């Protein structure tokens, strides 16, 4: 936060920065105890604390990291996906990653107009993250969403 002074305006970001190791530990402990209590109250399920810790915390975190890292690797490989917009980088739109990344794989769109909260610019570009943000807006948890101006939707085709 010393490097990014704007973060000080957001208490939730300051909290996460201050307790960055506590949150994952609490999450892992919660996963363990869900399995532990499930075994205690519903033994017929055959669930244990170790199982829910591994599946709900360890493997899901590894999967999340790999999918996240795919965005900045796979979405910049010239032989993968397509480039709708001419940008100064090698960003690509990778449709088959869109469901796993909640729309983050519309990476060329993002590099072309990064101010938009919407990464799937067209109806056929699955962008689950945008739907989550729109739902948050309904509950007052998000505001000032930036759309995609019409002039950005129909640019000159890239080479």
What are these regions (language model features)?
Residues 4-12, 80-106, 112-113:
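Active-site-proximal inter-transmembrane loops
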Residues 48, 60, 73-75, 79, ...:
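Generic serine detector
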Residues 78, 103-104, 110-111, 117, ...:
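Short leucine-rich amphipathic alpha-helical surface patches
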Residues 53-82, 103-109:
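Transmembrane alpha-helical segments that form the membrane-embedded catalytic/substrate-channel core
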Residues 1-69, 116-159:
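Non-catalytic, topology-defining segments of multipass membrane proteins
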Residues 72, 98-101, 107, 133-137:
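Generic alpha-helical structural context detector
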